[in-house]
Amino acid sequence: MRKVFQFFFTVYGFLIFLFLMVILLPCFIYAFLQKPVKGGNMIYKISRWLANVFFFMTVIRHQNIYEELHDKTKEYIFVSNHISYLDIPMMMKVIRGQNVRILGKVEMNKIPIFGAIYKRGTVSVDRTNAKERSKSINELICFIHKKISVFICPEG
């Protein structure tokens, strides 16, 4: 019985995600048409709203518990494990009021429509090519110099 519930809940969550993506597509397109930094920041603001609505509609609750509050006026390198599809939406809920870029795998850029949004909002890394990995690190450093925090998931 539990497996059946998990299956239907997964399908429900996926349909909610698709519905929200379709509703927000004009906002993502507008953000995509902006300059790279401004457009990327807009994508994260839209994604934070999407995460709030998604978690509300799927009745998933969370509570932020900080060992120490960080200064939102400074840039940081956030590091986390990434083992679930919910990790990134949860990260959207945790890192608030601060611009951020995620280091993400280049393979995600190939997904129709989502890939274009993903590419604008992340720093893509081709893990099979040492030169491209180095280029991605340099791009992250540039974002830090622009006062934008970065988020990496070394195990994801």
Regions found by a protein language model. Name each.
Residues 57, 61-156:
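Soluble catalytic domains of membrane acyltransferases
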Residues 2-64, 116-120:
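A transmembrane-helix-recognition feature enriched in membrane-embedded lipid enzymes
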